[in-house]
Amino acid sequence: MNYLQYYPTDVINGEGTRCTLFVSGCTHACKGCYNQKSWSFSAGVLFDDVMEQQIINDLKDTRIKRQGLTLSGGDPLHPLNVETLLPFVQRVKRECPDKDIWVWTGYKLDELDKQQRAMLPYIDVLIDGKFIQEQADPSLVWRGSANQIIHRFKL
């Protein structure tokens, strides 16, 4: 899996101060998507053990208290990304149990397959649904369009 961008300190993509990883690869091709450069699975750089350890280290860093990890993209729940992200979120929950995990996906919760659903026990907040430009509303919190739903599983 590739990722396009990593922000070790982010206050935009979820509650509190967070680490945010924008993964590469999305097949939804939403009209008006703000991150079209993330659609290609080959965009960005390889998410390797070094990057994974960096995120764990940042989450544990007591100099800047982070509430959790955000996964966006691209689409973190695309099956090609789940292969890499499932063991990663398992590790985050194991090594940083006090941190929450937020995930943005174009898939709807009721559309997820078995592989994608395997991620759910490790996700605290899931924002689902494709971005629909005709339903775009800049006043929405954590969502780009009115069809998207915020699912709070744990918090």
Swiss-Prot record:
What are the GO cellular component annotations? cytoplasm
Question: Which class of enzymes does this protein belong to?
Answer: oxidoreductase
- Cofactor(s) needed by this chain: [4Fe-4S] cluster
Looking up Pfam families in the UniProt record yields:
Fer4_12
Q: Tell me which residues bind S-adenosyl-L-methionine.
A: G32, C33, Y34, G74
The record's InterPro entries line, in alphabetical order, gives: Aldolase_TIM, NrdG, Organic_radical-activating, Radical_activat_CS, rSAM
**Residues that hold [4Fe-4S] cluster according to the record:** C26, C30, C33
According to the record, the segments passing through the membrane are none
Q: Which domain of life is it from?
A: Bacteria
Places the protein is found = Cytoplasm
Q: What's the Enzyme Commission number for this chain?
A: 1.97.1.-
Q: Does the keyword Iron apply?
A: yes
User: What is the annotated quaternary arrangement, including any partners?
Assistant: Forms a tetramer composed of two NrdD and two NrdG subunits.
Q: What is this protein called?
A: Anaerobic ribonucleoside-triphosphate reductase-activating protein
Tell me what organism the protein belongs to: Haemophilus influenzae (strain ATCC 51907 / DSM 11121 / KW20 / Rd)
